[in-house]
A protein has these predicted regions:
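Polybasic, lysine-rich low-complexity intrinsically disordered segments
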Residues: 2-3
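A hydrophobic, multi-pass inner-membrane permease signature
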Residues: 7-307
């Protein structure tokens, strides 16, 4: 009797393990499919940027073109080489400085509203949340930025409007609230101030959250072309995204008007230029992202659940 029970238990265990393996296999298959769908546009753009314009005109974009060429990149860097390098420099400066400023403002604001005994914390939290619900409109924002804050044709115009993202601020607040309050309480008893507590105790424990919002802000500054479009007229302050946007618009205009003097003598890469511009714009992100991916995943998960 006992042997029969053991036999039945073993069979049930084997069936459970078998079903778990099947579910795991299906799960991995779905993940692989999602990864393939996600990476396909990047690979497609990369291959398309090396495809000759004439080949694309005749055959369209393909994953395995019979001809490869650097003519699109040659055109881009030959016509806008210096401006591209200068715009890259502007984007790097704006991204580094802007990210540092935004992380500082976000972390300090989040810490203030996460302090347990701070009576005005709820008021500061609501003030930030209110800006997510309502705004003064584009015209009021533009007038305040240009006429009253002097954010016109300078690098500050590309940094200060994005000083704090409320979503990132609440993400950091959730991190801080998820930490044991006993750490802060014991530090206060020992005579430590809030600056010391924040820099020596809180920030080292919230490293994943800081890396997460740093990535968010870096992507925001690097990919932005709205602020240059609205606040920049001087081309020496153009960022890489905006100058690529203008370049693509100009090429599409010339390609749509073949009677112009320039377009009549040159075959413009009107189609492949989109692919090349995409690769130029996202190249630095693709290089950096794998090194901070683990912090990004951990930060989003923990920050969203705690608090």
């Amino acid at each position: 009797m006992k042997n029969r029970r053991c036999s039945k238990g073993g069979m049930l265990m084997k069936k459970k393990i078998s079903s778990d393996n099947i579910l795991t296999g299906v799960f991995y298959l779905l993940l692989a499919l999602v990864a393939l769908i996600s990476i396909f546009p990047i690979v497609f753009a990369f291959i398309g940027s090396f495809t000759p314009e004439n080949y694309v005109t005749q055959n369209g974009f393909t994953l395995f073109p019979k001809e490869l060429s650097l003519e699109t990149y040659h055109y881009v860097f030959q016509s806008q080489g210096y401006k591209l390098l200068h715009a890259y420099g502007n984007s790097i400066v704006v991204t580094l400085v802007g990210t540092a400023v935004s992380v500082f403002v976000t972390v300090t604001y989040a810490y203030v509203i996460s302090v347990k005994n701070f009576k005005a914390a709820s008021k500061f939290a609501f003030f930030a949340y209110f800006t997510m619900l309502f705004n003064g409109g584009m015209l009021a924002w533009y007038l305040v930025c240009t006429k009253y804050l002097g954010l016109k044709d300078n690098l500050f115009a590309l940094i200060l409007p994005y000083s704090m993202n409320v979503f990132n601020m609440y993400l950091m607040r959730n991190f801080f609230k998820g930490l044991p309050y006993e750490l802060t309480e014991s530090a206060l008893v020992d005579g430590a101030g809030h600056i010391t507590i924040l820099t020596k105790i809180i920030l080292p424990l919230a490293k994943a959250g800081i890396v997460t919002i740093t990535l968010f802000y870096a992507l925001q500054y690097w990919n932005d072309f709205y602020l240059p479009l609205m606040l920049i007229n001087d081309d020496k302050y153009y960022t890489i995204q905006y100058i690529l946007y203008k370049m693509m618009s100009n090429i599409q205009y010339l390609a749509a008007n073949p009677s112009s003097a320039v377009a009549s003598h040159i075959v413009l890469p009107a189609q492949t230029i989109k692919m090349a511009i995409t690769c130029i714009a996202i190249g630095p992100i693709i290089i950096v992202y794998p090194f901070i991916q683990k912090y990004f995943v951990k930060g989003v998960t923990v920050g969203a659940l705690k608090g």
